[in-house]
Regions:
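Hydrophobic alpha-helical topogenic segments used for membrane insertion/localization
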Residues: 9-35
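A short loop-to-beta-strand scaffold at the N-terminal edge of the catalytic core in hydrolase folds
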Residues: 58-68
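Conserved HGGG/HGGXW glycine-rich cap/lid loop of the alpha/beta-hydrolase fold
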Residues: 67-112
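Active-site loop/oxyanion-hole signature of alpha/beta-hydrolase fold enzymes
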Residues: 90, 103-145, 310, 319
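Flexible "cap/lid" loop of the alpha/beta hydrolase fold
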Residues: 159, 167-199
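Conserved alpha/beta-hydrolase catalytic His-Asp/Glu region
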Residues: 179-181, 204-265
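Conserved loop-alpha-helix segment in the C-terminal half of the alpha/beta-hydrolase fold
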Residues: 266-305
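Catalytic active-site module of serine/aspartate enzymes centered on a nucleophile-bearing elbow/loop
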Residues: 295-336
Length: 336
């Protein structure tokens, strides 16, 4: 046999074997990287000890919520984002338990609630919120306090199910999914629409303690010195729960975007807006524009605050909410 042919054949076989070996190693590595993470216990700090933790089923999954107090129902809805949960409001909502029935749920896909492998859409969350409010058997329509993208979802809830909402108090609502200084660019939306890559990036980078801490300090909190170890622990643990990537990746891929302007223009319930002056580059312009869209909406601006006002300056948020919730507050319903 020709020795040159033998060498060529051996070289080709070696390359094929090497390629197969590399491909196999990559598949093993990818399989390892995409393993469901080990379930970690969510820190007790996620809710005050005086609040009972309860669970109700919805069509999207089980909703875990914290409740205390008696009176008119007052529901606090956390923003949608990395490691999000009802912990966002945990320094605020206890202040209202002496005169209200205070309820703080984790949205499905976040916190301690179910985290199904579902391609979430805004209508799914609107329906989930409607089912949740019906399931907790409110004596009357609740006042809803919400932030960010979740605030936008609550506006849609009020438009589609007006009997389930008495009033909306919205902190920096949006329909884009932008969170604080974190912007969802077209490139990030493209990357996070690739399921395997998105899950890989989320599990092995974005949900790590270091990445969560960086995100909180650089994008979410105006004063990074206020990002405590407890805050990092709760956000990182929630981000690392099995299945936490499904809703988060959907959010980062732009799958939860909604038309906030149209919804605000159609809402027939009283709306109050609170805004952080440091929360976004165009904060003042955006807040004024949204105020004009919602009939008779009030606007309270916190010049040195951002999207996480409820944790950075809870006393200021509590004071603003008390002002909005006064019994003698005059509200004007939109005609029709």
């Amino acid at each position: 046999m020709d020795s040159s042919k033998t060498k060529t054949s051996s070289s080709a076989a070696w390359r094929i074997g090497l390629g197969a070996g590399v491909a196999g190693a990559m598949l093993v590595a990818l399989k390892y990287a995409l393993r469901p993470p080990t379930r970690r216990r969510v820190p007790d700090a996620i809710s005050p000890t005086a609040f009972a933790t309860k669970v109700v089923p919805t069509g999207l999954g089980e909703v875990v919520y914290h409740e205390a107090g008696r009176g008119r129902p007052l529901i606090f809805i956390h923003n949608i984002g990395l490691g999000a949960s009802s912990y966002e409001w945990a320094r605020v909502y206890p202040a209202f338990a002496d005169g209200w029935r205070v309820i703080a749920p984790d949205l499905v896909g976040f916190g301690e609630s179910s985290r199904p492998n579902v391609a979430f859409e805004p209508p799914d969350y609107v329906q989930m919120l409607a089912e949740f409010i019906r399931a907790i058997e409110c004596s009357e329509a609740p006042v809803i306090i919400a932030s960010g993208l979740s605030a936008g979802l609550c506006v849609q809830l009020a438009v589609q199910h007006p009997a389930l909402v008495a009033r909306l108090i919205l902190h920096m609502p949006n329909g884009t999914g932008d969170c604080g200084q974190h912007r969802l660019t077209w490139f990030s939306r493209f990357i996070y629409r690739l399921p395997l890559l998105a899950r890989f990036l989320f599990r092995n980078h974005l949900s790590t303690r270091a990445a969560v801490a960086h995100w909180l300090r650089k994008a979410i909190f105006v004063d990074s010195a206020l990002v405590t170890e407890e805050i990092i622990d709760v956000f990182a643990t929630c981000a690392q729960q099995p299945g936490a990537e499904f809703a988060a990746v959907r959010w980062m891929g732009g799958g939860l975007r909604l038309d906030l302007d149209t919804a605000l223009n159609a809402v027939a319930r009283p709306v109050a807006l609170t805004w952080g002056g440091e929360g976004a580059p165009d904060a003042e312009e955006t807040s004024r524009r949204l105020q004009r869209l919602a009939a008779a909406a009030s606007l309270t601006v916190f010049p040195s605050a951002g999207i996480m006002l409820a944790r950075e300056a809870p006393e200021e948020m509590i004071a603003a909410l008390r002002e909005q919730l006064r019994d003698d507050l005059r509200v004007i319903l939109k005609a029709g």
